Each structure stands twice: as structure tokens, then as C-alpha cells.
Amino acid sequence: MRTLLVLCALVLAGCAGVPPTPVAPADLGLPRRVHITLQSPGEVRQDALLVVQAEGAHATRWSLFDPLGMPQARQILQDGQWRNDGFMRPNGQASDMFSAILFAWTPVSALPSAYPGDDWRDTATPDGGRERVMNELCGPRWRVTWRRGAPADTFTITTGGGATWRVEPLKDTP
């Protein structure tokens, strides 16, 4: 019985592990500014602004703000590891969301080198859109969908837990 409990704990730990990050960099066209609509089951929809910029040769800075401009998360991805930037408290949900957006932004041609192995797939959907899935031991971690005819930088990410993150570029207005 004890062995079974330990085995179950290990399986569950694998399902809630550190989000995957690319092992090889891809050209992301930085800096980027996007609007994110976050919706978790049973919670009120939230809007956020994400700014991503290069930080030296091998790092990117990810800054998430609420609609009033208050920082919600600031993290740096360097050598495949997330770390906090400044005095913000750790935010695991932000790391997961940032990793999912990075997965979506990675060009199809760069996926095999950035995410080696067979944990992901990128396919056309029957309605003419596109879908990209990152799997983990317990099923899909993220499902990225692009509607038919939608720009490549406008997509929706659905997590294994049912949360959705709608990502679209900020409109440049004078």
C-alpha cells in the first residue's frame, strides 16, 4: 500500500512539474507587447498586458501588468530557467503561462530543436485552423489553437486544468 501511495505521488508530481522551456533559442521578434484575457473555471475574466524583451544574449524579460499598470509578475528566462526579476513574489502560474506563450511563439520549423522529443505536436484542424499541443505524463499541458484565417500572433491557450489564455497583439494607437 505504501509503495502504491509513493507511486501515485510521483505521478502527480510529474503532472504539476516545472513548465517546459525550449532548449534551443528561436527568433521571437522581440520586443513584443500583447493583451491577454485570462479565464479560469469558476472565476471572473481578467485582462492583462504582457511585455517581453531581450535581456542580454541568452535571456528574455517577461513583465505582466494589470489594466492599471500594476506589475503582477516579472520574470527572466535564462538558460531554460525562470527566475524572479526584482522583489515580486514567486508566481508559478505566470511561469506556466509565459512558457505556454513561448511554446506558441516558437516557429514550427524551430520546434524540433527547441523542444526535442515527442511531447508536442502541431497539426491542422478540420476547420482550417491550427492546433499545437504540449503533452505531459497526465495528458495535454497546453493546447494552443489558431482560428482559420487568424494572424499567427492571435491564439488561445487552454491548460490541462481548464484555464484559457487568449493572446493578441496590442493595437498601436496614436
Each model region followed by its residue ranges:
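Sec-dependent signal peptide recognition
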Residues: M1-L7
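C-terminal motif of bacterial Sec signal peptides marking the signal peptidase cleavage site
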Residues: V11-G14
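Mature, soluble, non-transmembrane domains
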Residues: A16-P20, I36-E43, L49-V51, M70, ...
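Short, low-complexity, disordered segments immediately C-terminal to signal peptides
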Residues: P20-G29
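Short amphipathic
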Residues: L30-I36
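Glycine/acidic-rich beta-strand-loop module
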Residues: G56-A59
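Acidic/histidine-rich, surface-exposed loop or edge segments in extracytoplasmic proteins
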Residues: Q78-Q81
